[in-house]
Amino acid sequence: MQSFLQSSELIISYFQSSLPAYLVLVFVFSLCVGSFLNVVIYRLPKMMERSWQQEYQQYFQPDQTVVESEPFNLAVPRSRCPHCQHQLTAADNIPLLSYLSLGGKCRYCRAPISRRYPLVELATALLSVVVAWQTGATSLGLLYLLVTWALVALSAIDIDTMLLPDQINLPLLWLALLA
């Protein structure tokens, strides 16, 4: 445990002394976060709608049997092409690079991929670099990055559905109250 703490302290001190290396790390990591945010942006409103439908059925139609559906959350099912429903490989999910290498089209059916996916990834990465540049490798910087990522997800969900999910809003509220 002691060696782990020493190693992590060395890594943190390196990034505190080398801003360019820290910004590159934040950019690459934030591209991955942006890819995950695309999943959140697409699936969280659908999960909320399913939950509302189940609650409605339980309250207004309690005598009807509940039909079990396939699991649908942020982890399952795996990502698929919205056109041909082919399950995407890990290589197809590499943030921004896979979009560019595939020319913005599905590898399997060649249907165009929405530009929103790379835009969310790139916006997340660029906003994160600005935050990291302003705050440096600090705990406050990490907090600001988390808030930035949450705001990216909330913005896109709001644009798509005019909803602001409590699953994202309430943690931000508590974070603001405790900070």
Language model feature labels by segment:
Residues 1-179:
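A membrane-topology feature that recognizes alpha-helical transmembrane segments
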